[in-house]
């Protein structure tokens, strides 16, 4: 049975983990890092770059490099590369494919099953888009799990037998969640982890802190009469510098942002050298920090607990490393210190791997009960939002309610599904619409239409409507207005596979070119260093092959390079044969070379000098 992996598909960075012997292990990527930047780039030659290599080249390839695509999941966002439009799902799939490949390299086997995490406050369309990204990447998505829930799973399994409340404060690169979970164990050491309440903001994360620094630096330049707000290259360099400054200010009280030749104006080059203190940084971002308070208070209120009831506070997401964040959490929690014993970058992926192990039967000692983050309902007369499933309801769940017609002899009803907490549907998120037709003619208020909402364990919604009078039924899986059809997903899977094959071919061609250059250089040097020892015909033949390879390397035909490379690989052996035959002749070189020549050229003599014996310990022999 193939193993399943757990994937934290983050806005800024992503992580993959797997269970080994029942315990989670974070898998390092091909570059040696335990986190992989969620950055995808299309090089001008057509190669798709993912991760650290994509991030490093961003400043020179701005329009073809995509970062923070997670913020576009579940929307109709697209990016145009060479006339082809890519959806957020397709770009995310590239990151997932890299994580999948790195896991396969580590495990030495194919990986097809995965648990992927999403922010707890992701709506239905965003969850569906994440599942589709996994499918495009060639993964069978076993489960979509909320990030704070996964973190609590990783943190809470080693807790004692008493029921304990864990508050997870998750501030990532692009999203923010707060969740309260109850963790308990029975006498058989079986753990139950149940989400009590969750709240969040899908438009708040470390990227916003970075942007405040970028805006500040742009304003500092504007004061000097320099406007770089439209300079894409300068903006990318500023973004990278802002992210680095944010990280440095987590451990230092001040940092220096120094960017030489940031841009060029008619007056000459623009250099930036600006000191940024932690106090100034916190002042620039204080309103962002303020936005984390309401979700925190909402969770405490919805769970109906006191702050003193919280046993553990876990910080998740790289952005929680900012001192102002951990100080605020301590303040909000009534002075309780957050736990510092977990890696905020890795704990979500570790929890996802544990859940993958549960679903595959590798772990049988835990039950995870999640909740739906937002209320679900339909539009009724007057545009009213009528809830069928309230937020923070444990999932999977199923609810039904009976509605009637608004007009006499109404032949059909439109079922419009919404997600949100507002009183009117216009203020909530529309998820989809379908129509139930064939209702028997009757005065208004007489027909009975039963609407059923069914939320699966992934948090994805299925809705059905049934006319109790005629028995007619209509149903749909809510996939959001921007979800992909089965045909779209199949096409994108095929496209991704083709790209993977192209990328592999390109890598092989590059490796061949590198090896060919090295071979041409070394053979050239060997001929030059041993010119007096080589017969003219051998020297001429091999040199011709070297020259042919060099000429092929100047061109763009990879097949020609490969052919010339293989030809030189074969012919260069004649050089060694000629050199060693010279060394073995009576007037040739003696010593080490001569001995080596004898070993290589005179097998019978060498065999005569070999004594077949074994070593015996004298003391052992006497026993």
Swiss-Prot record:
Xref: NCBIfam families: PRK00290.1, prok_dnaK
GO molecular function: ATP binding; ATP-dependent protein folding chaperone; unfolded protein binding
Region of interest called Disordered, as start-end residue ranges on this chain: 496-515, 579-609
Modified residues (Phosphothreonine): 175
Alphabetized UniProt keyword annotations: ATP-binding, Chaperone, Nucleotide-binding, Phosphoprotein, Stress response
UniProt biased composition (Low complexity): 587-603
Protein name: Chaperone protein DnaK
Role played: Acts as a chaperone.
Keyword Methyltransferase annotated: no
Pfam families per record: HSP70 (PF00012)
Basic and acidic residues: compositionally biased ranges: 496-511
Family the UniProt entry places it in: Belongs to the heat shock protein 70 family.
Up-regulation conditions: By stress conditions e.g. heat shock.
Alphabetical list of InterPro entries matching this protein: ATPase_NBD (IPR043129), Chaperone_DnaK (IPR012725), Heat_shock_70_CS (IPR018181), HSP70_C_sf (IPR029048), HSP70_peptide-bd_sf (IPR029047), Hsp_70_fam (IPR013126)
Signal peptide: none
Keyword Lyase: no
PANTHER family reported for this sequence: HEAT SHOCK PROTEIN 70KDA
């Amino acid at each position: 049975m193939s193993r399943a992996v757990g994937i934290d598909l983050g806005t800024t960075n992503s992580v993959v983990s797997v269970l080994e012997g029942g315990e989670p292990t974070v898998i390092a990527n091909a570059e040696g890092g335990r986190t992989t930047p969620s950055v995808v780039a299309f090089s001008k030659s057509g190669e798709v770059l993912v991760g650290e290599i994509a991030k490093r080249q961003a400043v020179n390839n701005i329009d073809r490099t995509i970062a923070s695509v997670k913020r576009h999941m579940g929307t109709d966002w697209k990016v145009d590369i060479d006339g082809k439009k890519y959806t957020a799902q397709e770009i995310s799939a590239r990151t997932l494919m890299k994580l999948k490949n790195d896991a396969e390299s580590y495990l030495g086997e194919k990986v097809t099953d995965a648990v992927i995490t999403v922010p707890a406050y992701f709506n239905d369309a965003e969850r569906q888009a994440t599942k589709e990204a996994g499918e495009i990447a060639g993964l069978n998505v076993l489960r979509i799990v909320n990030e704070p829930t996964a973190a609590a799973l990783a943190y809470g399994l080693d807790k004692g037998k008493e029921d304990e409340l864990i508050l997870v404060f998750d501030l990532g690169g692009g999203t923010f969640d707060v969740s309260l979970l109850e963790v308990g164990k029975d006498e058989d050491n079986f753990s139950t982890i149940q989400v009590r309440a969750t709240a969040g903001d899908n438009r708040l994360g470390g990227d916003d802190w970075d942007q405040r620094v970028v805006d500040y630096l742009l304003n500092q330049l504007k004061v000097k009469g320099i406007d770089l707000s439209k300079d894409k290259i300068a903006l990318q360099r500023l973004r990278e510098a802002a992210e680095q400054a944010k990280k440095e200010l987590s451990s230092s009280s001040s940092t220096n942002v120094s960017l030489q030749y940031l841009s060029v104006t008619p007056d000459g080059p623009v250099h930036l050298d600006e000191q940024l203190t932690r106090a100034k940084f916190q002042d620039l971002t204080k309103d962002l920090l303020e936005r984390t308070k309401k979700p925190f208070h909402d969770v405490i209120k919805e769970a109906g607990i006191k702050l003193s009831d919280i046993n553990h506070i876990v910080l998740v997401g790289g952005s929680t490393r900012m001192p102002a964040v951990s100080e605020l959490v301590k303040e909000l929690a009534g002075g309780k210190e957050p736990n510092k014993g977990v890696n905020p970058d890795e704990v979500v992926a570790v929890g996802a791997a544990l859940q993958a192990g549960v679903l595959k039967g590798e772990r049988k000692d835990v039950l995870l009960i999640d909740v739906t983050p937002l209320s679900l309902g339909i539009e009724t007369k007057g545009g009213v939002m009528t809830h069928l499933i309230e937020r923070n309801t444990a999932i999977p769940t199923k609810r039904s309610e009976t509605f009637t017609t608004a007009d006499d002899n109404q032949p059909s009803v439109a079922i419009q599904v919404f997600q949100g907490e507002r009183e009117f549907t216009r203020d909530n998120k529309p998820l989809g619409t379908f129509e139930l037709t064939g209702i028997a003619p009757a005065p208004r208020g007489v027909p009975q239409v039963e609407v059923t909402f069914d939320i699966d364990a992934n948090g994805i919604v299925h809705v059905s409507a049934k006319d109790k009078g005629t028995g007619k039924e209509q149903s749909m899986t809510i996939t959001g207005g921007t979800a992909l059809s089965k045909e779209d997903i199949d096409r994108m899977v095929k496209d991704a596979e083709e790209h993977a094959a192209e990328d592999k071919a390109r890598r092989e061609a590059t490796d061949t070119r590198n090896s060919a250059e090295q071979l041409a250089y070394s053979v050239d040097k060997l001929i030059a260093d041993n010119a007096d020892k080589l017969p003219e015909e051998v020297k001429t033949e091999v040199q011709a092959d070297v020259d042919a390879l060099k000429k092929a390397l100047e061109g763009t035909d990879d097949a020609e390079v490969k052919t010339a490379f293989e030809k030189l690989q074969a012919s260069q052996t004649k050089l060694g044969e000629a050199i060693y035959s010279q060394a073995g002749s009576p007037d040739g070189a003696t010593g080490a070379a001569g001995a080596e020549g004898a070993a290589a050229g005179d097998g019978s003599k060498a065999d005569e000098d070999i004594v077949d014996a074994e070593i015996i310990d004298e003391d052992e022999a006497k026993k």
